[in-house]
Structures are given as structure tokens and as C-alpha cells.
Curated annotation (Swiss-Prot):
The modification Pyrrolidone carboxylic acid is found at Q25. The gene is gnrh2. Keywords: Amidation, Cleavage on pair of basic residues, Hormone, Pyrrolidone carboxylic acid, Secreted, Signal. Stimulates the secretion of gonadotropins. The keyword Signal applies. One of its GO terms (molecular function) is gonadotropin hormone-releasing hormone activity. It comes from Clarias gariepinus (North African catfish). It comes from the Eukaryota. GO terms for cellular component: extracellular space. PROSITE patterns: GNRH (PS00473). Residues 1-24 form the signal peptide. Belongs to the GnRH family. The modification Glycine amide is found at G34. It is found in: Secreted. This is Progonadoliberin-2.
Amino acid sequence: MVSVCRLLLVAALLLCLQAQLSFSQHWSHGWYPGGKREIDSYSSPEISGEIKLCEAGECSYLRPLRTNILKSILIDTLARKFQKRK
């Protein structure tokens, strides 16, 4: 009985320790909490033309158009309903 209690105590301590370590964040150079990076620190001469266009606010390839998202959701919903009918 004593060994079972010790085993449960050790398991509980390890679980608490694992939970504490899993929520810790690794801080890399130039990164801030939440995954935000300092914009001024990333200045490389190898910046592509696409990134330069994004700085001007014209990066549509990074954000899908809302109409395409709604269209794909509707198509997926209709396809699921059609499969349920079969």
C-alpha cells in the first residue's frame, strides 16, 4: 500500500512538472512573446520581390479572398449533404 501511494505521488509530481514545462516558451533572438518578431531587425539583402510587394500592402497571395473561402465552404457542405443522401 505504501509503494502504491509513493508511486501515485511520483506520478502526480511528474505530471505537474511536465505540464509546467510544456507551457514554457523558448525565446529566440529577435522574437517576442506570442511569436511576434521585431520588424526592423529582419533586414536582409536577399529579400524577394514578393516580400517587397507585401510591404506595400499588395500581398493577396498570403490572404485568400473571402469569396473563395465562402465558395469552398458551400461546396464542401453541399458535397457532404449529397454523400449523406447516398
